[in-house]
Amino acid sequence: MGIFDELNLPAGVLYGDDVLKLFQYAREKQFAIPACNVTSSSTAVAALEAARDQKAPIILQTSQGGAAFFAGKGIKDSAEKREASVAGAIAAAHYIRSIAPIYGIPVVLHTDHCAKKLLPWLDGMLEEDEKFFKANGVPLFSSHMIDLSEEPVEENISTCVKYLKRMAPMKQWLEMEIGITGGEEDGVDNSEVDNASLYTQPEDIWQIEEAFRPISPYFSIAAGFGNVHGVYAPGNVKLHPELLGKHQAYVSEKLGGKDKKPVFFVFHGGSGSSKEEYREAISNGVVKVNVDTDLQWSYLVGIRDYILNNIDYLRSQVGNPEGPNKPNKKKYDPRVWIREGEKTMKARVEEALKDFNAAGTV
């Protein structure tokens, strides 16, 4: 028995109550779903293929920078309208929606880290969501993430409330962040923040729950428990996933104590974390774990090794160790070397699915 049997979910991109059911099931069964940042059709299919082969759900997400890359680096992305990142995110969404069903797994289609300066990007996507919802009864994206963790708590919550009210009629999921994740990722740089800012307080979690619950049940919280974006050796990041358990207990008591884990938590900045740290966080209600930095590296590894191993076939179009007139087209065809990156990225996603207990849940 698994997700399809117990929850009656479709293959392909999920929306609304199906997303809620998936996260409830993950929290109950103590697994988390990797959220893979994708920047192209190639990175998207690598993650989908990994999830298919591991019989697991997957979350595919685009950051603002990743979405702009999807549209093309030659397109202007103005601060006022974010034309390229809006168009790129929409293009990625339609592409993923089109191919996800043939992989036979549940997929959540998400956008990542929308800071205050990037809200025009979110506005543009929500306009498209509303048009799509009017025509199809579901939004284009399953969910969006707003990251106002650098702003005052009151501003963070009130802004998210405004957007949640807009998203609620579409039953669209909102992920928000409270407590700063250190380090730097995709233009959001918190590498110089005070360490105390890396730990969210239980009162903040309750303030969010109290504000959001009357509007919609479709939300999750990326809380800070020492998380840091970027690349760090194991042991160099001091995580305290036990704090998430204390947050759950605090909110549970406020709600009457019936539900012992009422909060959906998200784990950001996990590079260098141990399997034990991941699993402790998952046991405390983490249902989504962001995976970006490691996937960038893993994708490169396959391409790098292919080039190094075939360098004598890649110096010219004609001529190689087999003869001066031998063609090299089969070696430099992009479908060959890009596929090598997909293979190594796929392997890293499969590792994450196993580490987060998600493998075999479909």
Curated annotation (Swiss-Prot):
The lineage of its organism: Eukaryota, Fungi, Dikarya, Ascomycota, Pezizomycotina. Keywords: Glycolysis, Lyase, Metal-binding, Zinc. Its EC number is 4.1.2.13. The keyword Cell inner membrane does not apply. Binds 2 Zn(2+) ions per subunit. One is catalytic and the other provides a structural contribution. One of its GO terms (molecular function) is zinc ion binding. Catalyzes the aldol condensation of dihydroxyacetone phosphate (DHAP or glycerone-phosphate) with glyceraldehyde 3-phosphate (G3P) to form fructose 1,6-bisphosphate (FBP) in gluconeogenesis and the reverse reaction in glycolysis. Zn(2+) 2 binds at residues 147, 177. CDD domains: FBP_aldolase_IIA. This is Fructose-bisphosphate aldolase. Homodimer.
